[in-house]
């Protein structure tokens, strides 16, 4: 952590704890005490006593703030945007990692000592130990030997024992006789000429700045160029899968920066040495510079500030970058080439991205949910899953800020102890008397959020918080033709092809064209026969992840049948969620419901169309006949067939006529099953 040297504070000489000399003390001790008092109360004490003053720096963009409230308010904008992008990335990926035991490797790593921790609670406790060690960073430095002391008492004792020994070793002399009043003091010497100092150094290009305002303005040029490079990278991607790959690459950006910087400093490889040599030469004129900071100053002074923004050019693809580290990281893509997945033939730019992608095929679960025990392959999918358990964010700081990402939460906690990556001081500041601090202002009125415990100082911040955290995802990008909203700009570009009819992606096997690269890749699996997605329960393979997820619903159901039987609607209500509103049938999948609805659509179209040719009139169905059986004592004595249904009285009369004996009418039995 860069140390900020501030103005030295003067120690008052006439304090309550000043050294009191008794009148009974001998002359030798009085002379030594007077020498020590004069030394510690003069300019020597003020010029040798230093303490550190910490400023708060944003971990995302490097902006400096004097108070904690200002940097927290500023970081809120970065964190809300990045959490929304992570959620959208997880939803766009469309992949669900398998439920398998973890590999045993610790999912969390301490950023201070690189120790692997198994659970988030242990990681937070481990981080607290580091924070307590570095909680007190104020030290006092001796101006003669540059030794540091944790308290002013130790500093004064060191000055008395080490640097005032010459005055103590002098032979004692008797007290001087009383002298007349001293003459008036000479006029003070003129102040020394003011020296221009540039205490702020840029970590990207080593440029020195005199004030924090100039430092922030200079840092903005690097961040603008970085945003432009990321925007150009997104423009080159064609589909959501490639966008997910870019986001995986962004997760390893810090590792790539460290590897690139180590490659620049290494001398054992000729290509790295040539790249470092080319980084110190100006691309517009033959002048060579000794350092990257001198080169940046030369380009800004001679060729304008615009030329210093993207000063590093790739010799193979003519792309420009703002720093030599990014140029070296980009050059590895030309040297090492791309990396292809052997399972699904997906191509990645980095080996780390390929390894992370292959974990999905192997079913590794490195991140476990502490609530339900489910395993996930990436931290993004784990964070998205944890939001299903609770609506509030996962990590809460003592200052009131909440985070859904543990890494951002740990970086934020370091700002409370001053370890936020402040710029390095390269020159000291002349001492000046400390100014009295103004009384603290009363806190502004806080507006609480009705959905979470957070509160805000203004209504605009409260509305922005509710819209970004608790509201639905915004669709800021609109289609100029139909006005449909999208979350990302690349989705608008893909949607415009539906209006123009453009199909730029063609299959080399059958010549069929598609509007997106993802649809072409999905279609090519039908030619190659590759089924990259396999069910771990039954071993069945699928060409698309959506088909695998639909298939897994059969295994997750409480009852599984070898053959789907015909069950009543009440039995299928909780197992088949797709319902036909025409005939009332239930289906397990939407595809089955759509195929079934085509039958009703075809039937309706046939009823609406006129007959093409007169069809032969079918013969009338035979009229139903009614059979009446008359029995007597269990024996059938008459069978009567009628074409029209008869009443019960008429049937009894027919039976009596058939028997021919009126006295036997009481013994007649009518078989009502045939009436």
Swiss-Prot record:
It is found in: Nucleus. One of its GO terms (cellular component) is nucleus. SMART domains: ZnF_C2H2. Residues 225-234 have a biased composition (Basic and acidic residues). InterPro entries: Znf_C2H2_sf, Znf_C2H2_type. Residues 269-281, 418-427 have a biased composition (Polar residues). Keywords: DNA-binding, Metal-binding, Nucleus, Repeat, Transcription, Transcription regulation, Zinc, Zinc-finger. Signal peptide: none annotated. One of its GO terms (molecular function) is DNA binding. Residues 171-194, 611-624 have a biased composition (Pro residues). Residues 235-261 have a biased composition (Acidic residues). This is Zinc finger protein 526. It comes from Mus musculus (Mouse).
């Amino acid at each position: 952590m860069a140390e900020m040297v501030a103005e030295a504070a003067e120690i008052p000489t006439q304090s309550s704890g000043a050294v009191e000399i008794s009148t009974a003390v001998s002359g030798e001790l009085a002379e030594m005490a007077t020498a020590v008092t004069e030394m510690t109360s003069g300019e020597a004490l003020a010029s040798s006593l230093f303490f550190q003053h910490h400023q708060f720096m944003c971990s995302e963009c490097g902006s400096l703030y004097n108070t904690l409230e200002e940097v927290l308010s500023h970081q809120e904008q970065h964190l809300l945007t990045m959490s929304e992008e992570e959620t959208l990335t997880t939803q766009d990926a469309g992949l669900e990692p398998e439920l398998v035991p973890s590999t045993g490797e610790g999912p969390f790593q301490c950023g201070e000592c690189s120790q692997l921790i198994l659970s988030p609670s242990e990681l937070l406790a481990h981080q607290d130990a580091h924070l307590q060690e570095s909680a007190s960073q104020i030290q006092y430095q001796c101006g003669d030997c540059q030794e540091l002391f944790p308290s002013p008492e130790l500093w004064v004792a060191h000055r008395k024992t080490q640097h005032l020994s010459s005055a103590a070793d002098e032979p004692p002399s008797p007290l001087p006789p009383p002298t007349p009043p001293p003459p008036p003091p000479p006029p003070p010497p003129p102040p020394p000429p003011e020296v221009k100092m540039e205490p702020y150094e840029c970590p990207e290009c080593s440029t020195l700045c005199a004030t924090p305002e100039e430092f922030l303005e200079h840092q903005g040029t690097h961040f603008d160029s970085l945003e432009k490079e990321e925007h150009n990278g997104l423009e080159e991607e064609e589909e959501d899968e490639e966008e997910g790959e870019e986001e995986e690459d962004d997760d390893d950006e810090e590792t790539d920066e460290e590897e690139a910087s180590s490659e620049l400093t290494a001398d054992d490889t000729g290509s790295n040495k040539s790249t470092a040599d080319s980084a110190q030469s100006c691309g517009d004129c033959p002048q060579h510079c000794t350092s990257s900071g001198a080169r940046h100053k030369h380009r800004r002074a001679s060729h304008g500030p615009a030329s210093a923004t993207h000063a590093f050019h790739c010799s193979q693809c003519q792309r420009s970058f703002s720093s030599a580290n990014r140029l070296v990281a980009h050059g590895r893509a030309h040297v090492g080439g791309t990396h292809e997945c052997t399972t699904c033939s997906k191509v990645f730019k980095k080996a780390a991205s390929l390894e992370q992608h292959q974990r999905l095929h192997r079913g590794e679960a490195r991140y476990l949910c502490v609530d339900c025990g489910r395993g996930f392959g990436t931290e993004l999918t784990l964070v998205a899953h944890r939001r299903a358990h609770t609506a509030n964010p996962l990590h809460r700081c003592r200052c009131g800020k909440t985070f859904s990402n543990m890494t951002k939460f740990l970086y934020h906690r370091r700002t409370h102890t001053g370890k936020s990556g402040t710029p390095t001081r390269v020159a000291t500041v002349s001492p000046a008397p400390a100014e009295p601090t103004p009384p603290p202002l009363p806190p502004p009125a806080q507006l609480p959020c009705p959905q979470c415990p957070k509160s805000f100082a203004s209504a605009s911040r409260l509305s922005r918080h509710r819209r970004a955290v608790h509201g639905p995802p915004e669709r800021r990008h609109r289609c100029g033709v139909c006005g449909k909203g999208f979350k990302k700009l690349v989705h608008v570009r893909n949607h415009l092809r539906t209006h123009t009819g453009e199909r730029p992606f063609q299959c080399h096997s059958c010549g069929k064209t598609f509007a997106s690269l993802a649809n072409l890749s999905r279609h090519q699996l039908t030619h190659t026969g590759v089924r990259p997605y396999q069910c771990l329960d039954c071993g069945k393979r699928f060409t698309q992840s959506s088909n695998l997820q639909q298939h897994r619903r059969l295994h997750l159901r409480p009852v599984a049948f070898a053959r789907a039987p015909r069950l009543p609607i009440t039995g299928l209500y909780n197992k088949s969620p797709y319902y036909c509103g025409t005939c009332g049938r239930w289906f397990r999948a939407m595809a089955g419901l759509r195929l079934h609805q085509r039958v009703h659509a075809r039937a309706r179209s046939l009823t609406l169309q006129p007959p093409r040719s007169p069809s032969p009139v079918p013969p009338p169905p035979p009229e139903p006949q009614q059979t009446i059986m008359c029995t007597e004592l269990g024996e059938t004595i008459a069978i009567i067939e009628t074409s029209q249904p008869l009443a019960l009285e008429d049937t009894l009369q027919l039976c009596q006529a058939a028997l021919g004996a009126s006295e036997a009418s009481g013994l007649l039995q009518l078989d009502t099953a045939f009436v």
